[in-house]
Each structure stands twice: as C-alpha cells, then as structure tokens.
C-alpha cells in the first residue's frame, strides 16, 4: 500500500474547493487545499462530478429528472456520471419516496462520503489519502463543538482481560 504524503497543489482545483466547503461541517472554517476536505475529494472527484454535486443540496434527495433540470445535462450521460459518483462513494442513493423512484443524495462527510470512499480496498490502495480524509473528518468537525473529543482520539485504553 502506498504511504500517504500530501503536498498541496500550487493551483488548487476551484470546483473541489467549492465542493469541499459545501459539504464540510466544520463550523466557521474556510476550506483550503491543505485541508482533508480538499485532498480527500481531489483524489477521486473529477471537475465534472464536482459541477454536478454543487447543484445538489447536502442530505436532500434528488431524482434523476431533478438533477437533469438543475444541471442541464443530457439524461443518459448524467445517469452514468451519477452511477460513477455513487461507485466511488461521493453520492448515495435510495428509493425511499412514495413513487419508489431512485433518488441521489449528496451526504455529509461523516457519516457519509468520507466513509464510503474507504469501502473499496483497491480504492484505498490507489488513493491512501482517502483513509486520512476519513480519520480527519471523524474528528475535526468536533473541535469547536466538543474540544475534548479531539484529545480523546489519542488515548490508549487498557485491555480488559
């Protein structure tokens, strides 16, 4: 497995910065290319995927027809892209509506895409930054809400025999 070492790009991808900011739940934080919100998304998300995701609201289900309307993209092309976005873990989908129509959801990071990015071992091996992304997004949002949570992440608990 490749070791994760990250150097922020000199020219960050603007769409990835915007998407990272849209999804983050870190209170009062502006996402930069040095943040896990950036490097986690940047590893797997294309600019085209980011454009589509930016037309969605976090945790608000949308049908294919609604996303077609929001993006102006051709239905068949968009459906394939949404499937790819779901396969990498950026989106989730369900049929939890009265018509049982497939709907896509842009989740928050944890629980959500930070976890989904780590569900395929080959994806983690190819992009080890997603493991760091998940670990960081499990704790960073809590810093301003519950400062003690971050310090507890490094405790070693005794083994109970």
Predicted regions and their residues:
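A short, conserved structural fragment
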Residues: 86-96
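Conserved small/polar residues in nucleotide/adenosyl-binding loops
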Residues: 153-159
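Short amphipathic alpha-helical interaction segments
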Residues: 73-84
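Hydrophobic residues on short alpha-helical segments
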Residues: 53-54
